[in-house]
Design a protein with these regions (language model features):
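Signature of the chorismate-utilizing enzyme
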Residues: 1-144
Length: 144
C-alpha cells in the first residue's frame, strides 16, 4: 500500500468510475476508488465480526507506506452491509487505486504490487445526470 501526495485531485465527482463506483465525497473532499485489490462477501449475524477479522488480517500482512497520513489515506476499504443478516449479502471492497482530497491536500493510494501514474489512472467523466423525477410508492414490511 503506497500513498503519495499529488498536485490536485481535480473534481472527485468526475473521477467516479462508471462500471464499479466506490466513493465517499462531501463538499469537494473525499475519496474515489476503482479496481478491486481484495473483496469480501459475507452474510449472517457474525458479518461485522467476520469483516473485522478479515480486515485486521489484511492490514497485518500489508506493507503500508503512507507519506500523507491524513484520514482516508493508507489501507482503505468501502463496505455495504445488509440490514437483514440472513437474507442479503454484505460486500467489502479494497480498491486498487484511490484518489482523495482533504482540506486542500490531494493524494493517490495504490494497493497491490507496483505503483500507478496518476495521469493514467482514471479518465475524467461527465458528471452524473440529476434525476428528472421522483416516484413515490407504498412500501411493505415483513414481521421480523
Amino acid at each position: 500500500v503506497s500513498t503519495r501526495p499529488i498536485a490536485d485531485a481535480g473534481d472527485l465527482l468526475r473521477r467516479i468510475p462508471r462500471d464499479s463506483p466506490v466513493a465517499w465525497v462531501r463538499n469537494g473532499d473525499g475519496i474515489v476508488g476503482w479496481g478491486v485489490a481484495a473483496r469480501l462477501e459475507v452474510r449472517g449475524r457474525e458479518r461485522f465480526s467476520r469483516t473485522q477479522r478479515w480486515w485486521n488480517q489484511l492490514c497485518a500482512s500489508a506493507v503500508i507506506d503512507d507519506t500523507v497520513s491524513v484520514p482516508g489515506t493508507g489501507a482503505i476499504a468501502f463496505g455495504s452491509f445488509a440490514f437483514d443478516p440472513e437474507r442479503d449479502m454484505s460486500v467489502v471492497i479494497v480498491p486498487k487505486v484511490v484518489i482523495g482530497r482533504r482540506g486542500g491536500q490531494s493524494w493517490i493510494t495504490t494497493i497491490g504490487l507496483g505503483t500507478a501514474d496518476p495521469a493514467e489512472l482514471s479518465p475524467v467523466n461527465a458528471l452524473p445526470k440529476a434525476p428528472t423525477s421522483v416516484t413515490w410508492s407504498r412500501g411493505s414490511r415483513e414481521r421480523a
